[in-house]
């Protein structure tokens, strides 16, 4: 699964070159998308004995489904890598999707650089589980979609990632 995951990240990175060629903006039901990703990673929740708390996700956002799926998969994968007890909470509030874990957290000196290409930080070096591309890719995709990706963290407490969806005035047919 690890090699598969790295290969997928590299392929998505290469696809960024033609990002706008297959961009399809439409209403995407968030709960359905999040549950799809959680189901994909269910075995890891079970193996690690982690809880998952999904709430307030009954909302649709204007985005490209496949690219948002890449972002959510990457963020959930990261949360699972660095969380060994407790769980992950995913919810929507004030035009923002939050993913909050009870993982090991990220040092203040690293949090400012987590979205840089190739940066894996202290945790990535410690666990040898980071390519340094996943969060970079997620940020690039979010920027291309017009979404804001932000992260806050406390060592020993966990990390919260927020994807903010700007209100768009699009004509839907």
Map each language-model feature to its residues.
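Conserved micro-motifs of the catalytic ATP-binding
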Residues: 18-23, 56, 60-63
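A conserved beta-strand-to-alpha-helix junction within the catalytic ATP-binding
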Residues: 24-42
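Short helix-loop "hinge" at the ATP-lid/N-box region of the Bergerat-fold HATPase_c
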Residues: 79-80
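Acidic ATP/Mg2+-coordinating residue in the GHKL
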Residues: 101
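Short conserved segment of the HATPase_c
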Residues: 106-119
């Amino acid at each position: 699964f690890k090699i598969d995951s790295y290969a997928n990240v590299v392929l998505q990175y290469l696809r960024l070159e033609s990002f706008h060629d297959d961009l399809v903006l439409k209403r995407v039901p968030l709960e359905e998308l999040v549950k799809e990703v959680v189901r994909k990673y269910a075995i890891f929740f079970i193996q690690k004995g982690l809880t998952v708390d999904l709430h307030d996700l009954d909302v649709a956002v204007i985005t490209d489904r496949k690219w948002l799926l890449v972002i959510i998969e990457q963020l959930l994968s990261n949360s699972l890598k660095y969380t060994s007890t407790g769980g992950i909470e995913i919810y929507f509030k004030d035009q923002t999707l939050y993913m909050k874990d009870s993982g090991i957290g990220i040092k203040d000196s690293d949090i400012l650089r987590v979205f840089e290409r190739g940066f894996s930080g202290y945790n990535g070096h410690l666990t040898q589980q980071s390519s340094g591309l996943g969060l970079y890719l997620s940020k690039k995709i979010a920027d291309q979609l017009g979404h804001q990706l932000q992260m806050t963290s406390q060592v020993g407490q966990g990390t919260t990632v927020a994807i903010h969806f700007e209100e768009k005035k699009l004509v839907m047919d």
